[in-house]
Structures are given as C-alpha cells and as structure tokens.
C-alpha cells in the first residue's frame, strides 16, 4: 500500500499555485496522472522520488515512512526504491547506450540489459553515444534504463512522447509487463495512456 498526503506551493513566472495530492494506492497498480499543464505533475513526481521536499505532508510505502514533514523524517532519494524517468531523459553523455542502461542495473545482468536493448530496438545502437541519437532514440534509452532498475515504484513522465507510433504500442506492452512480473506500482504522466487499453487504469487528477 502506498499512502501520501502532500501540500506544496509552486512558484512560477505568472505567480504561485498550491499542489495538493492525497491518495491511498494498492501495490502493483497502474496510475495515470492527469491535470492541466503546469499544475505540478512533474513536481509531484520529484516529491515522491525525494528530489524535492514538500512544504507539508507524508509518504508511506508498506507502512515504511519515506517522508513526514511534521516529524522531520526524510528518507534520501538514493535510499528509496523508486526509479524515475524525466522528460529531459538525463542520459550520461560520456556513456554509450548500453553503458547508460547497464549503469542503472545494479546486478549488471547482461541478459536483462540485452532484453531491453532488443525490445526497444536499441541493439544496433548499443555502442553509440547519446549526442548521436535522435530525441526518440534517447527516450527509448531513458525508458529502458528506468525499467531495468526493477524498482518498487516507477515514475514515468511522458515516456512515449517522442517515440514513433510503430514502436509505441510494443513499448507500452513492456511497461505493462512490469506490473504482473514484479509487482511494481507505476505512475505515468502520458498523453498516450489510451495505448494501454489492455490494463485497468486508475486515474489520479492533480
């Protein structure tokens, strides 16, 4: 069970707004995050991952407290079993495609790494550096690097926005396999959630 109650003020060039999110979610759920542009969906992800500390709130995962502002409890990002994919991909420029994916795989299991290289049509690019990749190719690498971590909670911020339509469905299928195979809870911000029609989506509006 994942439980959170978060309140956080966001400052923008046009003023400020309040992000307020409260929910209880069953482990292994697939959650589609929706809301107006600029409302704070990415900020919410950063709070879950431990990158940002909210003004007020708590986060509990299976009764373990990740965050409790009232009692000054904060589990650092590196100690949370959470993987996150940002819209800017954040690939390591001095690492090849394969090295970027392998870096995130703590067991360095070559079979798992090769699995995602094949499934995301990256095998032919495994020795290429990010600067030589298109936006869609970089996005596929970033998604593979996120999924290969086998995290308890997976946060995906527009993971398919730059991917060719011909690959989008197969990549969505790989995302959906994570649920039954390892029981991860997936939160996804995406305009392509309709491609996941074979799974029961829970919608969280921010």
Label each residue range with its predicted role.
Residues 64-69, 110-126, 176-177:
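Conserved ABC ATPase "signature" region
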Residues 66-84:
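ABC ATPase NBD coupling module
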Residues 129-133, 137-139:
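Conserved ABC ATPase signature
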Residues 143:
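Hydrophobic anchor residue at the start of the ABC signature
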Residues 148-152:
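A short, proline-enriched helix->beta-strand linker immediately N-terminal to the Walker B motif
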Residues 154-158:
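Catalytic Walker B motif of ABC-type/P-loop ATPase nucleotide-binding domains
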Residues 183-190:
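Conserved H-loop
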């Amino acid at each position: 069970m994942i439980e959170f109650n978060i309140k956080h003020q966001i400052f923008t060039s046009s003023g400020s707004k309040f992000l307020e999110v409260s929910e209880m979610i069953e482990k292994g759920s697939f959650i589609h995050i929706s809301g107006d542009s600029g409302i704070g969906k990415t900020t919410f992800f950063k709070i879950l991952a431990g990158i940002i500390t909210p003004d007020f709130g708590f986060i509990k995962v299976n009764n373990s407290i990740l965050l409790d502002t009232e009692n000054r409890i904060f589990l650092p990002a590196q100690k949370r079993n959470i993987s996150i994919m940002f819209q800017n991909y954040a690939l390591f420029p001095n690492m090849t495609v394969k090295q970027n994916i392998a870096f995130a795989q703590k067991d360095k299991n070559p079979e798992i790494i090769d699995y995602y290289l094949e499934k995301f049509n990256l095998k032919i690019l495994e020795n290429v550096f990010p600067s030589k990749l298109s936006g869609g190719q970089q996005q596929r690498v970033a998604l593979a690097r996120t999924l290969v971590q086998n995290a308890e909670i997976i946060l995906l911020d527009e993971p398919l926005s730059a991917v060719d339509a011909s690959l989008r469905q197969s990549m969505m299928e790989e995302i959906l396999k994570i649920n039954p195979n390892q029981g991860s809870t997936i939160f996804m911000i995406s305009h392509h959630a309709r491609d996941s029609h074979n799974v029961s989506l829970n919608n969280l509006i921010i």
